[in-house]
Amino acid sequence: FAFTEGPTCDKNGNLFFVDQPNDRIMEWSTDGKLSTFLQPSDYANGMMFDAKGNLIACADEHNELWSIAPDKKISILVTNFDGKYLNGPNDVWVAPNGGIYMTDPFYRRKWWDHTMMALTNQAVFYLSPDRQKLFPVVNDLKKPNGITGTPDGKTLYVADIQGDKTWRYDILPDGSLTNKTLFVAKGSDGMTIDENGDLVMCANGQTNDVTIFDKTGKQIGHIDVPEEWSANVCFGGKDRKTLFITASKSLYSIQMRVKGANPAK
């Protein structure tokens, strides 16, 4: 692989992830078979399955948000905000109600013609379950990147990788956020939650490994990753106790004692 990212698992525990510079989405089945699911993929980045089995993907080539059906039919959910291109949809979390939270930082890509970000802020957006409303819910972070939430749909975590902090928010019924509190003084490229509410976090520029924090923000675990960068994580496998780590040019897995909290992440 050239650079792996965006891990998510379907309802059967099969892993899907991106090999972004090679413009492809890969599948690693529960019986250990590797195949190409979609190529080209619009240089997809962060991904997560929704409850209907659609693969929600940050489509990086044209700064869009896609929904890829099981038959690989593509629906474009978001193309712009207020008539302007998004900066670069990076990672997503699909809430239990079907709403989608998306981080939109700016990382200059070699496949873009433009060199400046289109929007003033590097924000977190929310797309309503009916796909009719898109609005920013976080505007005050330096570079939001990793994102995940609790399976009850009440709490959202957002990592500010440039600010090197991860924040916790309460989710309101309309999808907006309140009660911003500091979870831990560490940013993260990607992250996920286990069934105990522990947060599993990837590289932040200071460390390239995977670090685990309990719900109070206390570090309780550390996984050495023999790569230059750990980009993202998700739980999968038949028992949902396998932690998959996309890291630089490789894909890693480690058997955990706990399951993932979210069905697809």
Residue locations for each model-derived region?
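Sequence-structural signature of mature extracellular/luminal beta-sheet repeat domains
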Residues: 1-265
